[in-house]
Structure formats: C-alpha cells, structure tokens
Amino acid sequence: MLPWTALGLALSLRLALARSGAERGPPASAPRGDLMFLLDSSASVSHYEFSRVREFVGQLVAPLPLGTGALRASLVHVGSRPYTEFPFGQHSSGEAAQDAVRASAQRMGDTHTGLALVYAKEQLFAEASGARPGVPKVLVWVTDGGSSDPVGPPMQELKDLGVTVFIVSTGRGNFLELSAAASAPAEKHLHFVDVDDLHIIVQELRGSILDAMRPQQLHATEITSSGFRLAWPPLLTADSGYYVLELVPSAQPGAARRQQLPGNATDWIWAGLDPDTDYDVALVPESNVRLLRPQILRVRTRPGEAGPGASGPESGAGPAPTQLAALPAPEEAGPERIVISHARPRSLRVSWAPALGSAAALGYHVQFGPLRGGEAQRVEVPAGRNCTTLQGLAPGTAYLVTVTAAFRSGRESALSAKACTPDGPRPRPRPVPRAPTPGTASREP
C-alpha cells in the first residue's frame, strides 16, 4: 500500500500546484501581427486559375480574428505594377476581408513579383509607412511559379526584417529558387499544390500562419552568411528564471552550442557560423514560477564565405557583415524552358532548353513525384542531352517535374513544371458467347 500512498500524495501535490498557478503555463495568447497576401494577378495566370486562387485566399482569411490592435490583413496584386486591394487595418473581421478578396479583379500585365516585394517592404512593412513595430509579420505569396524580374534579393530583405514567408505554387517555377525564397524549413513554408486542390492545405496553412503570429514566437532577423540575430518577446524576468539557448547544425547533431541567458534577455546574436547551412535553434525558458514550453526554430544562413566572429551577449553587437554569393558565370545558366510531350497514361517525355555540353555541366537530375504527395523518383541524364522519358507513372495524375543542371563548378540550377498523365483506356468488355441456335450444331474452332 505504501507505493500507492506515495503516488496519491504526488498527484495531490501536483494538482494543488496546478490550481495555485505555480505550474500552470501561460494562457494561449491571441495572434497579433500583420499578414500580407501577395497574389499573382498577371496575364500568366488564366482567369480560371485566378478565380480558384482567389477563393483559396478567401477561405484562409475568413476565420482569422482580425481587429484593431490585433491581427491585420492586406492584399497586394502582382502585375506590371503592384496594386493594393486593401491595406492593413481596413477590415476588422475575417468575413469582411473574405468579401473583399472575392470581389477583387485580376490586374493582368507582366509578372513583376520582385517589384511587388520592394513595394511591400517600403510601403507596407516599413515602420516609416505606418507598420507596427515589434509585432510578427507574415507574407503569403500565391504564385504560378514564374516571375519576370528577380525575386531572391527583395525577398531576402523582407526575411532579414523578420518577415515569415509562406509560398504556395500551383505547380510551375524553379523549385530551388522557391525553396530559397520561403522561410526555413522549406517543407513547412513551401507548398506545391494543383490549383484544383488548394482547399486541401487551407487548414494546415492557416494553422502555420497563426503559429507564426503568436506573441511568444521565436524568430530570426539580420541573417547573413556567418550568423543571425534571434529575438523573442519577454517571457521571464531577471528574478523569475533564465533561458538556455541551443544551436545545432542540422547535419551535425553532435556540434551543439549552448548559451545561458538571464531572464530579462530578449535577443541574442549567433556569429561565426558556416554559410548556406541549416541550424536548429531551441529557446528553453527555465522558471520556478510557471511552466513554459521550449520554442524551436530552423534558420538557414545565406550563401557566401564565412567571416570571422563570435557570439556575444551585447544586444547591439550586430551581425557579421553580409557576404553575397558570387553570381554564376554566363555559361552556367541552367534550364530556361521545359516542354512536356508524348503524354501517355504511364509515361511522358520531358525536354528542356538550352542543352549544355560536357565542358560546363556534369549532367542533369530529373526528379518527379505526384503533386498530391508520394515518393519522388529521380533520373540521371548525361550532359549534351536535353530530353528523357519518364516511365512507370500513374494514369490521370498530376506530377511536379524538376530538371536540375549540375555544373562542374559545384553549382546547380533548376526549373520545375507541372505535368499530367491522361486517364488510362477503359478495359474492353469480354464478348459473351452466344448460345447455339436450336436445330444447329455448334462448330469446333
């Protein structure tokens, strides 16, 4: 009976602590921040695709708790010039924002996404233009995958400001570029979905958006090739506890770095890191007053050469200077166009241009997998060839096909496209043998 008595006392003590609030975690805080939808409204999108995407954005925003001083939403169109359908703070409910999204018209014109991103940074996300300081900022870019101007540099500037970037592509575009443009990890922030299946990701994406806008959210800013700044809202005080901050390279779990910080700390700079590397960060609040869950984040440093430096406790120490990656040589230009042909229920042909010789390229990797999820497959194509036939496909299925050129310098360049196999032929009905006519003998074959 003694073990059961001890167990009962332990449970009673735990319940009493929970009722007193000593072990109770903080209540679920309402999301607060600025959410921008960047919608491809150019002529590269068909009217049908635009209507489906518009309905998708409306479904995303309808249940959101919009309101003054809380969560605000904005919609910007991508075209020859960016166009603001409605700015932050115009709508005080998700239903009103949904009605405005549904009433929006396609702008047509060129796909100047980079220009729209610069506009978003200067006119909407900048504090000088009325943006709220200290609140989470999220960008949801819905695109058909292509852009007439560079997207990488202006998108990186937004992420350096602390903007969390989600990307939804309807199946075309450069997979590597979109992965780099989205916030890390890409598997959480980048979605390739057929335009008729966008409803499948509504609930998951909305939940991810709300998680990114919680006040307790740990986030990274000032990301360079050799470091980044971590920031978080005040969760503790100097008297109520302390933080343990852990940094682990994703590919080297044994190379962890740890730092203990006082309870009144709200940021920290990690420096002296490797370029173009994923790091898993954990912020663990330790307190005897209340139980707080650890916060986990993955951050990818920018490409370039690592610079000297070490992390320091000074909030204003500043990150290491930004190292810009060298631009690829002209002869290292990757695939610029993909053509899908000879589509059969279980195969299709993929061609691309330009074709690169063995002097510049080692060859091509062609990766393909179902858009709705499934195992991806890979085919190797030697340099000098610019086509291959994909076999063993499923009838009536949409695939994402990515052609990656591997250069001798170690660089890679990729382009993605959506391909669909037709439905297979219906099986022919087997002939029913006819009964012999009365009075006649059946013939042997």
UniProtKB/Swiss-Prot annotation:
Its main location: secreted. The modification Phosphoserine is found at S74, S80, S93. It comes from the Eukaryota. Glycans are attached at N264. One of its GO terms (cellular component) is endoplasmic reticulum lumen. The keyword Signal applies. Residues 1-22 form the signal peptide. It is found in: Secreted, Extracellular space, Extracellular matrix, Basement membrane. N-glycosylated. Residues 311-325 have a biased composition (Low complexity). Residues 214-304, 334-427 form the Fibronectin type-III domain. Homodimer or homomultimer; disulfide-linked. Interacts with HSPG2. Promotes matrix assembly. Involved in the organization of skeletal muscles and in the formation of neuromuscular junctions. This is von Willebrand factor A domain-containing protein 1. It comes from Homo sapiens.
